Each structure stands twice: as structure tokens, then as C-alpha cells.
């Protein structure tokens, strides 16, 4: 899947696209450099599965979007190995192992529902230090 397509879908979401499903993320999390932090993504329709192709997108303070994870656990080219995607229980998860101050950003989860993407509201990650 092309990352540009996912990012364009994110922008389209802000224009008022409507879906029956609701994707929920933590609104904010705080961690310290070197710590491991896990962000989660829950679906109102039930358990998140590999068929939802969970994607994770990072938005830095300068408003640039970077695709991190596609298809639940596939890192995009050039994304550091400290970022990993998985399914934990009934949720999709993004784990940052050994967080760095440069990881401070908003992280959006997107889930696929048959013919469209639905995005969560984003998790604002603060990295102290």
C-alpha cells in the first residue's frame, strides 16, 4: 500500500468522511528517554485483527506525516527498529522500545474496514527530558 494514499486518506478524514466504526486511541501518554511505551488502537466493532491492516502514522510538531507501520507489523522503509506493530489482546499496538526525545509526536492509528480506512483521534506522546 502506498503511504501517500494513507496520508491522503487521513487528510480526507478531516473533511467530514463518516463511518459506522469508531477507532479509539489514548489521548495522551508520557514516557522518558530509554523507556518502552505502547500505544493502542481499539475498534468499536470488536477485536482488531490482521484483516484490519492496522497502520500507524506519526505527525511531528512541524506537521509532517510519516508512515511507520503498515499491515499490523510491517515497518516502512527507513523507520527505526525501535518502532514495532502488533496485536495485543483485542487491540492493535505500536510499541516504541527505547524512546528518544525525537519520538515526541502525535501518533495516528488507521484500521481498514472492507472498503475504507477509519482513523483514531491520535495519541500525543510526550518524551520527557
From Swiss-Prot:
Record-level GO cellular component terms: immunoglobulin complex
Keywords, comma-separated and alphabetical: Adaptive immunity, Immunity, Immunoglobulin, Pyrrolidone carboxylic acid, Signal
Residues annotated with Pyrrolidone carboxylic acid modification: 20
InterPro entries in alphabetical order: Ig-like_dom, Ig-like_dom_sf, Ig-like_fold, Ig_sub, Ig_V-set, IgV_Light_Chain
Signal peptide annotation: 1-19
SUPFAM superfamilies: Immunoglobulin
Entry-linked Gene3D superfamilies: Immunoglobulins (2.60.40.10)
Statement: the UniProt record of this protein carries the keyword Signal: yes
Highest taxon of source: Eukaryota
Biological process (GO), any one: adaptive immune response
Keyword hit for Signal: yes
Domain Ig-like: 20-125
Transmembrane segments: none
PANTHER family, per database record: IMMUNOGLOBULIN LIGHT CHAIN
Miscellaneous note of the record: Compositions and partial sequences of RPC 20 show no differences from MOPC 104E. The sequences of J558 and S104 seems identical with that shown.
Protein's name in the database: Ig lambda-1 chain V regions MOPC 104E/RPC20/J558/S104
Gene source species: Mus musculus
Amino acid at each position: 500500500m502506498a503511504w501517500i494514499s494513507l496520508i491522503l486518506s487521513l487528510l480526507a478524514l478531516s473533511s467530514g468522511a463518516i463511518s459506522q466504526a469508531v477507532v479509539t486511541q489514548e489521548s495522551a501518554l508520557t514516557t522518558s528517554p530509554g523507556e518502552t511505551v505502547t500505544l493502542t488502537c481499539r475498534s468499536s466493532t470488536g477485536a482488531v485483527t490482521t484483516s484490519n491492516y492496522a497502520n500507524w502514522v506519526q505527525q511531528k510538531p512541524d506537521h509532517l506525516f510519516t508512515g511507520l507501520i503498515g499491515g499490523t507489523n510491517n515497518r516502512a522503509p527507513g523507520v527505526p527498529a525501535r518502532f514495532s506493530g502488533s496485536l495485543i489482546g483485542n487491540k492493535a499496538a505500536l510499541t516504541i522500545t527505547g524512546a528518544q526525545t525525537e519520538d515526541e509526536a502525535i501518533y495516528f492509528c488507521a484500521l481498514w474496514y472492507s472498503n475504507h480506512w477509519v482513523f483514531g483521534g491520535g495519541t500525543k506522546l510526550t518524551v520527557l527530558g
